[in-house]
Amino acid sequence: MPRSHPIEDYRNFGIMAHIDAGKTTTTERILYYSGKSHKIGEVHDGAATMDWMEQEQERGITITSAATTTFWNGRRLNIIDTPGHVDFTIEVERSLRVLDGAVCVLDGNQGVEPQTETVWRQADKYNVPRIVFVNKMDKIGADFYRCVEDIKTKVGGRPVCIQLPIGSEADFKGIIDLVRMKAVVWEDEALGAKYHDEEIPDDLKEKAIHYRNLLVEAAVELDDDAMTAYLEGVEPDEALLKLLIRKAVRQITFIPVLCGSAFKNKGVQPLLDAVVDYLPTPIDREAIKGVDVNTGEETVRLPSDSEPFSMLAFKIMDDPFVGSITFARVYSGKIESGTSVVNSTKDKKERIGRMLLMHANNREDIKEAYAGDIVALAGLKETRTGDTLCDVNKPVILERMEFPEPVIEIAIEPKSKADQEKLGIALSKLAAEDPSFRVSTDQESGQTILKGMGELHLDIKVDILKRTYKVDANIGAPQVAYREKLMRRVEIDETHKKQTGGTGQFARVKMIFEPNEAAAGNAFESNIVGGAVPKEYIPGVEKGLYSVLNSGVLAGFPVVDVKATLIDGAFHEVDSSVLAFEICSRAATRRALKEGGSVLLEPIMKVEVTTPEEYTGSVMGDLLGRRGQVQGQDMRGNAVVINAMVPLANMFGYVNQLRSFSQGRANYSMQFDHYEQVPANEAAKVQAKYA
């Protein structure tokens, strides 16, 4: 069956914003006016169609990006709803990665807020073309022109108004469309579905002409012929002006700014028109790059149905009715349900079973998907976020998504045996859905450790465990992953002898222990010649070594980067055994760690703080107070970026501290960089706490 809409009619876009800017309400209205949602859901009463997880409805924040397909003026819109909280920036990055464009929603009262700055920078990183919708124009204190100024000063964008508001706060009635030079007014009683054109009010004519001139001047810069005509007194007509604005958006030359009030049902239809008129289609964007699996060389996949099939998985969710659902974007070719494909990232075969088009959390089964489609796949076994699925005969790995290392960990203990079983299943599903959430087991205590991007991130995971999976558990305090290291080369000669009547135990080992290169890991080798220690006992020596290295002598943390060499030993025909050599090796390793001068290591994080200039001094002083070493600073747009190396132990609670002294305008990212020796006074505190 041929595709129902040509790829030129596709708009894959996301709606990004600060928490509470009205992003979910805007999406709701888009779905309502484009006919996909029969009742308008309000975030205020926890019923918005897009916010479909309980945790989101309760907190009124959007956590997961739900993908929705709808239609407007014959065009197919695939909308990705992105979260607006700083602990979920991984979700935002993940959705920006597969978008062709974005609508940035601002609160008309607040302007560009801290999370807007973060998301804007992420959109810059992926070169996502965007338009801005200044929302909440009905709110007390709403100021459209201040928001436009904010785009210049806070995120370094070049805003160009294509609409102006008519009135504001309680008197907000409609908009002036500067492209058509008409006023558009909404009729209140029709839930915003009815609106009409009028002439521009007399008191706004002068302002409209001024901003129209700014728009035309910015647009004609993009075309020599249009510029020449304009200088000769001929303005571009509506069709050409739209074409030039579209070009500006595609090249991110300037950012068109629109306005309205989604909650009061004003301005949403012209926003949809702007999405269709100005945001790029899949073929307007650069072809996606990848690596040809067969040759190892870089290749590109064009957004065409005739190219070999390739798609990128960008989100995994556990659906209570369908099971595991993988959201993916088809970049090239076409795919039918029932087809076998290869997961080239993992080199595993997958079969495409059910394919679904998602509308928030309603779903429609489809048989084929084409280049440009965003679909949900049910029943994939091996695929994780960031994996490529492609044609078995033309394998390619598309650009990999990079996910930051988790920086905070907590211990979790199920309260009963039944909870223990449920916990294992639930955690494996949560880890598959979210690559920035990791699960591991503490070797010493046997505790399950959860690792994530921030305190809210882990709070929400624990909440999901309790609500969705009904797991009852105790939660520990956040911890740092320390390590221990041997400092000097030592030679140890150890004998283990035990005689208790009957068969005794006997083993002797002579071993050299020395520091290995940083990050080289632990290593064991045997240089035994002449059978001083028979071959069958050597695994016992290795096992004894590693059992001690898993829990060091200082404070019970894993020992890293040790090389141990077995050079000699002795055995007894009757009394020696694998166990005897294991016990002997354990004793030798403990002695070596004490005599060789073990030290504690701590994780050092590479911290990048982005802050408005006026808070630079406070940020630097605070980092130094956290035992940080500032590596340098530079300007990005109009913000200062400070790079520093800081021990993780001193970074707990940092996000709240940073928010408080920067009024929430500074933000930071951090990732693990290396391990470094803990200063003696700090090491004593750690040992007292853990030993």
Curated annotation (Swiss-Prot):
Belongs to the TRAFAC class translation factor GTPase superfamily. Classic translation factor GTPase family. EF-G/EF-2 subfamily. Residues 8-283 form the tr-type G domain. Catalyzes the GTP-dependent ribosomal translocation step during translation elongation. During this step, the ribosome changes from the pre-translocational (PRE) to the post-translocational (POST) state as the newly formed A-site-bound peptidyl-tRNA and P-site-bound deacylated tRNA move to the P and E sites, respectively. Catalyzes the coordinated movement of the two tRNA molecules, the mRNA and conformational changes in the ribosome. Keywords: Cytoplasm, Elongation factor, GTP-binding, Nucleotide-binding, Protein biosynthesis. One of its GO terms (molecular function) is GTP binding. This is Elongation factor G. Its main location: cytoplasm. Disulfide bonds: none annotated. SMART domains: EFG_C (SM00838), EFG_IV (SM00889). The lineage of its organism: Bacteria, Pseudomonadati, Pseudomonadota, Alphaproteobacteria, Hyphomicrobiales.
